[in-house]
């Protein structure tokens, strides 16, 4: 139980520090710099740090701390509730940034800046989290610091099946995100948190259900067991393909690339009035008939 308390304190401290950094950067930086870089970097750091600590609980908790799947899934749900409330509009996910680009909601320079911020934030969180584990504040952190040099791959299936799993998770996530984008935050955040928890339960045993290239790169790309190209296929190509399919299914086309709707018939905005014929038009028709 002491190890769980330490992990809960880690989650709380991470979210609190990131919230302070978020508010400070919002107050000190220009609005454009904050929206396109600082907000994304802090959000990615918060997500990556919590994901790394959650991975310790998932891998070591059941046998070292006696944690059951019900507790772990509850923590996943609560963490994503907190992320959804505190991210201040940041996605912390490269596929969401690419979706905004394909939907003509962001320019190319802005998208590249968001992508670089997400990668840097996730990598910084990985380094800081490992430093925290080195303090050995709990038995789980002690075990994790001893095993850090010998991490195992999160890909526990074939590359093709891993691509399908990550692509399917990303597809359902983005389709839900597109459907809920105009709904209230009080409905959108719990719905997405529940979806992420469900996918963590179903797809976690196969790929850990990242559906986030920046997060996967910071957590598992350096681990032995698979090549960098195999990791890229599963955790980058799979999610990007799933995102594109979700946009196509929702929109019928990719607005950035082409305007022709492939799936849905577009109705005309103007309707021809269907009123009664005037007497003059009736006479004209009668003359034509003669």
From Swiss-Prot:
An example Gene Ontology molecular-function term: channel activity
Region (Disordered): 271-290
Localization annotation: Membrane
Domain of life: Eukaryota
Gene Ontology, cellular component aspect: cytoplasm; membrane
Membrane topology of the entry: Multi-pass membrane protein
Motif NPA 1 positions after renumbering to this chain: 93-95
Function: Aquaporins facilitate the transport of water and small neutral solutes across cell membranes.
Name the record gives this protein: Aquaporin-12
Species per Swiss-Prot/TrEMBL record: Mus musculus (Mouse)
Taxonomic lineage: Eukaryota, Metazoa, Chordata, Craniata, Vertebrata
């Amino acid at each position: 139980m002491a190890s769980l308390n330490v992990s809960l304190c880690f989650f709380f401290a991470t979210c609190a520090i990131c919230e302070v950094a978020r508010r400070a950067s919002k107050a000190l930086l220009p609005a454009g710099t904050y929206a396109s870089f600082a907000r994304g970097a802090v959000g990615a750091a918060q997500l990556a740090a919590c994901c790394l600590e959650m991975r310790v609980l998932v891998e070591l908790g059941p046998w070292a701390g006696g944690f059951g799947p019900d507790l772990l899934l509850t923590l996943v749900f609560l963490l994503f509730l907190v992320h959804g409330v505190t991210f201040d509009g940041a996605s912390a996910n490269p596929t969401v940034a690419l979706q905004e680009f394909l939907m003509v909601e962001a320019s190319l320079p802005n998208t590249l800046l968001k992508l670089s911020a997400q990668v840097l934030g996730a990598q910084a969180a990985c380094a800081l989290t490992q430093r925290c584990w080195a303090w050995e504040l709990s038995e789980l952190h002690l075990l994790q610091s001893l095993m850090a040099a010998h991490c195992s791959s999160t890909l526990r299936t074939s590359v093709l099946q891993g691509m399908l799993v990550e692509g399917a998770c990303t597809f359902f996530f983005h389709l839900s995100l597109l459907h809920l984008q105009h709904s209230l935050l009080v409905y959108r955040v719990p719905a997405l948190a529940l979806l992420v928890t469900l996918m963590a339960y179903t797809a976690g045993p196969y790929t850990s259900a990242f559906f986030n290239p920046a997060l996967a790169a910071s957590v598992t790309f350096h681990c032995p067991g698979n090549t960098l190209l195999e990791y890229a296929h599963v955790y980058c190509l799979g999610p990007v393909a799933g995102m594109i399919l979700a946009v196509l299914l929702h929109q019928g086309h990719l607005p950035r690339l082409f305007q022709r709707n492939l799936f849905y018939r577009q109705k005309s905005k103007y309707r021809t009035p269907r009123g009664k014929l005037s007497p003059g038009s009736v006479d004209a028709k009668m003359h034509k008939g003669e």
